[in-house]
Amino acid sequence: MKRTSVFLIASVLAIAPLKAARADVSPRAAATARALEARYHDAKTLQAIFLERYSDSRQGLQTESGKVYFSRPGRMRWEYESPEQKLFISDGKTVWFYIPSDHTVTRAAIKESTDWRTPLALLTGKAKLSQLCQTLDMSSEAPGARGNVVLRCLPRGEKAKPKAAADDLEASIAPVEDQFDEVLLEVNPESGELADVRVVQPGGIELEYRFGNWQENLPLTESLFHFQAPAGVAIVEQPK
């Protein structure tokens, strides 16, 4: 079932900085990563449209689309608009995944959530790709847009203790371990704009988000990042 599978797909961006073991980073990949970090780390808010593609050997390709909002510290709102309305919210401490047609909402502490979208809140943080990947190099994959390049990130398999304080977002997100093979990030090397993220998981499962129309530092209301379950909606705790 797609909903269950999405909760199992974790992003390389979840892994907190390590105290040791430097990543193997090619010079061109390092320059592209710096452009990406410079583009987003100073933004207080971000907004974009997204197209999600999920594929596995049993269900084939499924496509959804909507809008996503990010705000410091570690808050997100994913509004799915087509083909079905859904809502994924992180308020920095708790993540909620609400499907109105199911009359249920799944809830998890951010430190326990393995949903791969959760770590993307670090776009507005200070994490560096060179600290998050065991290997970071240029992929031979063709980019979707002219002028872009594709970074290939191989995740660190070991769990790591973060340098940051316990209440830091990087320290609070659940670590991942052997849940995916690689992450491909399509980036414009000049502007640093993130165009696409593709997570490749064992078993032929892939989850891809294509982003567009990025807007930075727009005024976003606090209420966007808080969820109140409507009357009659069952709250289900995500299994630990």
Where do the protein language model's features map onto the residues?
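Bacterial N-terminal signal peptides that target proteins for export
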Residues: 1-8
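Bacterial N-terminal signal peptides
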Residues: 8-16
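N-terminal leader/targeting segments and the immediate start of mature chains
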Residues: 19-62, 229-240
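Short, surface-exposed coil-to-beta transition loops
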Residues: 63-65, 83-84, 91-92, 178-182, ...
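An acidic-aromatic
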Residues: 67-119, 207-208, 213
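Extracytoplasmic segments of membrane-associated envelope/inner-membrane machinery
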Residues: 98, 105-140, 147-153
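Gly/Pro-enriched, hydrophobic low-complexity segments
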Residues: 129-232, 236-239
